[in-house]
């Protein structure tokens, strides 16, 4: 048994290569091999968002606070609120973040395949974000 104590891991700033705007990442769990699943609480300030990306085994988001937006490639921008759960299928190109005026926090859960949980791509343009 391993108990991950709240606040035991340091918060981190979302790197500019992967995010637009101010993003804080609070790791929640990342068990050792052979386990593959990891989770983090991710907080986006208004206007902040991920770059386009995919996950080899998919991703689940559980919205905790605020108002956010998500989009899969070729689809409309969708609004997400506390209590909403979003599933992105393996390989589905997408982004997620806060709305333009309201911060948003979600728990992100994904699995690693070959030691990798995400493939980062280009940034979401302001035009794409505001659609």
Task: Annotate the PLM regions.
Residues 1-37, 117-131:
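A short, N-terminal "cap"/entry segment at the start of jelly-roll beta-barrel domains
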Residues 24-27, 38-55, 90:
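Conserved short histidine dyad/triad with adjacent acidic residue
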Residues 30, 54, 62, 80-82, ...:
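Conserved strand-loop elements at the edges of beta-sheets that form or border functional pockets
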Residues 41-45, 54-70, 109-111:
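Short, conserved beta-strand element in jelly-roll/cupin
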Residues 50-52, 70-71, 88, 93-100:
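Short beta-strand His + acidic residue motifs that chelate non-heme Fe in jelly-roll/DSBH
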Residues 60, 87, 101-121:
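A short hydrophobic beta-strand segment most commonly corresponding to one strand
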Residues 74-91:
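Short acidic-glycine-tyrosine-enriched beta hairpin
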